[in-house]
């Protein structure tokens, strides 16, 4: 019980602390940061690949990113639950 509460407190701290540490800062994505670094290193760089689908707005892009992450998490946790259930079934037999 004590270990669970300690882990829960650590997770809450990891979620809350960035808002206080970088108060008023902008949370940009890694794509924008990578683009600025590439422009600093090689200003004449021309991308060799274009996206298959360009979302109409940033909100739709965020939605698709969130859906992708949620689907990935669902698959991972389904597999973990399946393996855990299989292990319990084998232990009872």
Curated annotation (Swiss-Prot):
It comes from the Bacteria. InterPro entries: CbiN (IPR003705). Pfam families: CbiN. It is a multi-pass membrane protein. Its main location: membrane. Keywords: Cell inner membrane, Cell membrane, Cobalamin biosynthesis, Cobalt, Cobalt transport, Ion transport, Membrane, Transmembrane, Transmembrane helix, Transport. One of its GO terms (molecular function) is cobalt ion transmembrane transporter activity. One of its GO terms (biological process) is cobalamin biosynthetic process. GO terms for cellular component: plasma membrane. The chain crosses the membrane at residues 5-25, 63-83. It is found in: Cell inner membrane. The keyword Cell membrane applies. Pathway: Cofactor biosynthesis; adenosylcobalamin biosynthesis. Forms an energy-coupling factor (ECF) transporter complex composed of an ATP-binding protein (A component, CbiO), a transmembrane protein (T component, CbiQ) and 2 possible substrate-capture proteins (S components, CbiM and CbiN) of unknown stoichimetry. Belongs to the CbiN family. Part of the energy-coupling factor (ECF) transporter complex CbiMNOQ involved in cobalt import. HAMAP family: CbiN (MF_00330). This is Cobalt transport protein CbiN. It comes from Salmonella arizonae (strain ATCC BAA-731 / CDC346-86 / RSK2980). The gene is cbiN.
């Amino acid at each position: 019980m004590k270990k669970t509460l300690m882990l829960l407190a650590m997770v809450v701290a990891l979620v809350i602390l960035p808002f206080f540490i970088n108060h008023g800062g902008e949370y940009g994505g890694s794509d924008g940061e990578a683009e600025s670094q590439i422009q600093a290193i090689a200003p004449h760089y021309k991308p060799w690949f274009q996206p298959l689908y360009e979302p109409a707005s940033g909100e739709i892009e965020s939605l698709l990113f969130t859906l992708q992450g949620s689907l990935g998490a669902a698959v991972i946790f389904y597999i973990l639950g399946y393996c855990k259930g299989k292990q319990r079934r084998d232990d009872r037999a």
